[in-house]
Amino acid sequence: MNRFLQLCVDGKTLTAGEAETLMNMMMAAEMTPSEMGGILSILAHRGETPEELAGFVKAMRAHALTVDGLPDIVDTCGTGGDGISTFNISTASAIVASAAGAKIAKHGNRSVSSKSGSADVLEELEVSIQTTPEKVKSSIETNNMGFLFAPLYHSSMKHVAGTRKELGFRTVFNLLGPLSNPLQAKRQVIGVYSVEKAGLMASALETFQPKHVMFVSSRDGLDELSITAPTDVIELKDGERREYTVSPEDFGFTNGRLEDLQVQSPKESAYLIQNIFENKSSSSALSITAFNAGAAIYTAGITASLKEGTELALETITSGGAAAQLERLKQKEEEIYA
């Protein structure tokens, strides 16, 4: 039996170094599917430790195609998997934040557990998805936003894809994506499906010395800042950790309706995002987009508070800035350099 599997079966936890070695073995296909399934199942049942997660992250980053990042880029990649079928809030908020001046490196994928993944909705919006690291950097420099399609940067994940699919439940890999941005973003807004997992991820990420990261987990189950319930926030900034709760009314939002945010397909999600940018959507959809874009603007260092960031995001949408940015992002490379 694999020695790490034996340790887990015996009820022991792994050191960060052991977890790193274990993940390296998974990424290099040096374990059988049943060994991987056994370990992932035990970890999911007992819960990972911060040391284990930090070791896994270190290995994931080592196996990824990484790019020397641009300074002060922001990622808005969350864990997904909240099961509520909302439109692509983090993708919409990334576009708004980039229109307000934030440099966004949006890390994402096609849908795995949701109705619409970030790559799916960008395709529906006719936004160019960059295919190389150089094109991503160029897009960020030109338009303040680039998209990192996860499979292009984490090719070693193919060795665990089959096992994850067969298991069918959330594993540690749901937590690793947001902590493994290929442009090594030190500023992030990370939506998490539970506050317990948010705390775990924050403890693991602290060892990598982030500049400014917000983990958000709302009490209505969204992995976003919510306008239908209070949201628990863990904020890492310049070596300090703060934990607090925000409510929609503190930011001038009336309590929204969850049904106004739900979609059944990437096409519906894209349609709703376009309506938000054209000031034709429900107040719930507008408010939640501005709230989450505000967090990205704040972590980018453009504003001094989340409230100011949210106000700037609202102004960016209502003034037509977000709609204009969407049109810029639709341009093909040959049009940009013409």
Curated annotation (Swiss-Prot):
This is Anthranilate phosphoribosyltransferase. Its EC number is 2.4.2.18. Homodimer. GO terms for molecular function: anthranilate phosphoribosyltransferase activity; magnesium ion binding. GO terms for biological process: L-tryptophan biosynthetic process. 5-phospho-alpha-D-ribose 1-diphosphate binds at residues 78, 81-82, 86, 88-91, 106-114, 118. Its cofactor is Mg(2+). Binds 2 magnesium ions per monomer. NCBIfam families: trpD. Keywords: Amino-acid biosynthesis, Aromatic amino acid biosynthesis, Glycosyltransferase, Magnesium, Metal-binding, Transferase, Tryptophan biosynthesis. Anthranilate 1 binds at G78, N109. Pathway: Amino-acid biosynthesis; L-tryptophan biosynthesis; L-tryptophan from chorismate: step 2/5. Mg(2+) 1 binds at S90, E224. Anthranilate 2 binds at R164. GO terms for cellular component: cytosol. It catalyses: N-(5-phospho-beta-D-ribosyl)anthranilate + diphosphate = 5-phospho-alpha-D-ribose 1-diphosphate + anthranilate. InterPro entries: Anthranilate_Pribosyl_Tfrase (IPR005940), Glycosyl_Trfase_fam3 (IPR000312), Glycosyl_Trfase_fam3_N_dom (IPR017459), Glycosyl_Trfase_fam3_N_dom_sf (IPR036320), Nuc_phospho_transferase (IPR035902). The lineage of its organism: Bacteria, Bacillati, Bacillota, Bacilli, Bacillales. Mg(2+) 2 binds at D223, E224.
